[in-house]
Amino acid sequence: MTKEVLIHQIIDVLARAGFALSDRCNIRPRSFDVAARKDETLLLCKVLFNIDGLNEETAREMKYLAEYLGGSAIVVGAKTRDQMLEDSVVYMRYDILALNVQTLYDYFIENVPPLVSAAPGGLYVSIEGDILKKARMGQSMSLGTLASMVGVSRRTISKYEEEGMDASIDVVLQLEDIFGVELAKPINILKSCGSRKPRKKAESRTETQEKPYTLLPEDLILNTISMLGYDVLPTTQAPFKAISRDKSSVILTGVSEFNTTVVKRAHLMSSISCVTETQSVFIINGHSKIKSVENTVMIEKKELDKISDSQELLNFIEERRETHDEK
């Protein structure tokens, strides 16, 4: 299987599951390959044949983009190191959940969540602690008795019941056989990935740019947007330069001089914005030959400089889009 085949399989699964899909991101490097939405579920999907190809910088950007856009970041791949990814098993890379196409299919089309997670040392299952404790006490069985039956310590059984420790597959099967109940806790692949502090992320990047001689024109433009009242998250591996967010809106924000590459990126940003349900704006440092590209509004820097707050910017975007739609 090639990566191209893998991407087509993933797109097919998501489409069959009822997701609306963005165009594929064709930039390098890229933090995600496709955005997908179904109702309130938004996915930013990174495709890697070998999931070990995910690096920390890309994973970090995936997490922050997902947080800003109210979605989940996942990696879909085929192998890790020298072995193929197992079905119904999830893997973690830099706090990003990774899985294979079959697991993706089972989750979104068959409504069958994975139960097993891979970790150093083997495969593990999270236990429904309350169910285990209720079953044990229902049979008036002590911690010690149960521990001896499955070959673990009393403390380990206690940890299982407190949901403070995962168990091996063999142990879970033994426990389920003893009590005749299902104990494996389903894994929600849409869960939030770790703690995210997007504001600090944006600030830390800004701090590295505070030296006057290192500021680039696009950085100054992002500062202007920030002064309008937006929380600005700069990006390094996305089709847009930043995500700008306030209490009422989220804007995919491109910054560049006008050229043919800008038009291509504006098309891609438009597609992504339709899926993420955000605004899409390209700030042109200089003259722009066009006013908009599909849903992406082009704004010259001199026009941006005349805008005083976030609401005025939104009004400007809406007016320009309406003008484009009337043509």
From Swiss-Prot:
Residues 143-162 bind DNA. NCBIfam families: PRK04140.1. The keyword DNA-binding applies. Gene3D superfamilies: lambda repressor-like DNA-binding domains. GO terms for molecular function: DNA binding; DNA-binding transcription factor activity. Residues 132-190 form the HTH cro/C1-type domain. HAMAP family: HTH_type_cro_C1. This is Putative HTH-type transcriptional regulatory protein Mbar_A2318. It comes from Methanosarcina barkeri (strain Fusaro / DSM 804). InterPro entries: Arc_TR_HTH, Cro/C1-type_HTH, Lambda_DNA-bd_dom_sf. The lineage of its organism: Archaea, Methanobacteriati, Methanobacteriota, Stenosarchaea group, Methanomicrobia. The keyword DNA-binding applies. SMART domains: HTH_XRE (SM00530). Keywords: DNA-binding, Transcription, Transcription regulation. Pfam families: HTH_3 (PF01381).
